[in-house]
């Protein structure tokens, strides 16, 4: 299942040759901008994490929980079609956040991040931050095709969504440097099979770290924090090619 971008485009029955050329050009331009962003992140000294998932899986809640660790400093770029509600939630926790509203776009692109980054820098001194989280638009499809220059890609899967999503949306989970099963305390109420998730993830992409989180269990959030800190200390850079 580990297909290159060109192979994925060529295997798409909804795209003709001309459409493939257009999409390929758009994605290539995004790649160039994403590489420029990587250099910008280095200059700012921030380690960048791209959070992806379905809507309502708990991305913002995870960030709220991480904000409780006072030695874990970060700011956030929030992606949604409309409203600044998620940015407001984080600001209420003392986190500097800038909301990107995409209109009808189902993902964030590198050019959007570039513009928003300038705005975020007006709100906070990013050189005093250890991390920048990019909370992508809630969608298990489109964000998997657009590089935003992040060093670490984390995908959330919430228990109410069901345990069958990994092989249904393989392109998304192929992006993952780690997978978080969120709302894990509700697993029993939804008949969610952790065994199935592990098997499907192992079939798709072996050795991907898997975390179970619950907003009620601080230790589960601490494990995610520790993982991110470890990756930053290693200067880990995702090997995934969008």
Curated annotation (Swiss-Prot):
**Can you tell me which residues bind Zn(2+)?**
106, 142
The record ties this protein, via InterPro entries, to: CobW/HypB/UreG_nucleotide-bd, Hyd_mat_HypB, P-loop_NTPase
Which portions of the sequence form the region G-domain? Answer: 48-211
- Record's keyword terms, sorted: GTP-binding, Hydrolase, Metal-binding, Nickel, Nickel insertion, Nucleotide-binding, Zinc
What gene name does this entry carry? hypB
Tell me which PANTHER family the record gives: HYDROGENASE MATURATION FACTOR HYPB (PTHR30134:SF2), HYDROGENASE PROTEIN ASSEMBLY PROTEIN, NICKEL CHAPERONE (PTHR30134)
| Taxonomic source organism | Helicobacter hepaticus (strain ATCC 51449 / 3B1)
Physiological role: Involved in the maturation of [NiFe] hydrogenases. Required for nickel insertion into the metal center of the hydrogenase. Exhibits a low intrinsic GTPase activity, which is essential for nickel insertion.
Please give the name of this protein.
Answer: Hydrogenase/urease maturation factor HypB
Knockout phenotype, as recorded, reads: Strains missing this gene do not produce hydrogenase or urease; addition of Ni(2+) to cell cultures compensates only poorly for this loss of function. Normal amounts of apo-urease are produced by the cells.
Q: Which Pfam families match?
A: cobW (PF02492)
Annotated positions binding Ni(2+) = 106-107, 142
Family, similarity comment: Belongs to the SIMIBI class G3E GTPase family. HypB/HupM subfamily.
């Amino acid at each position: 299942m580990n297909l290159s971008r060109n192979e994925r485009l060529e295997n798409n029955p909804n795209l003709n040759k001309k459409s493939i050329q257009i999409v390929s050009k758009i994605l290539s331009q995004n790649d160039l901008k994403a590489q420029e962003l990587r250099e910008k992140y280095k200059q700012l000294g921030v380690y960048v994490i791209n959070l992806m998932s379905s809507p309502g899986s708990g991305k913002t809640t995870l960030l709220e929980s991480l904000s409780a660790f006072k030695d874990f400093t970060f700011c956030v770029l929030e992606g949604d079609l409309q409203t600044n509600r998620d940015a407001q939630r984080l600001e209420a926790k003392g986190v500097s956040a800038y909301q990107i509203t995409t209109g009808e776009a189902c993902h964030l692109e590198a050019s959007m991040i570039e513009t928003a980054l300038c705005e975020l820098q007006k709100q906070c001194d990013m050189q005093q931050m250890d991390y920048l989280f990019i909370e992508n638009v809630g969608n298990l499809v489109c964000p998997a095709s657009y590089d935003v220059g992040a060093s670490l890609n984390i995908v959330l899967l919430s228990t109410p969504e069901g345990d069958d999503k990994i092989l249904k949306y393989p392109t998304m989970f192929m992006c993952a440097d780690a997978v978080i099963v969120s709302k894990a305390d509700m697993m029993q109420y939804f008949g969610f099979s952790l065994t199935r998730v592990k098997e499907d993830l192992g079939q798709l992409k072996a050795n991907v770290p898997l975390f179970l989180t619950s907003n009620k269990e601080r230790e589960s959030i601490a494990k995610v924090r520790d993982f991110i800190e470890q990756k930053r200390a290693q200067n880990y850079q995702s090997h995934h090619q969008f």
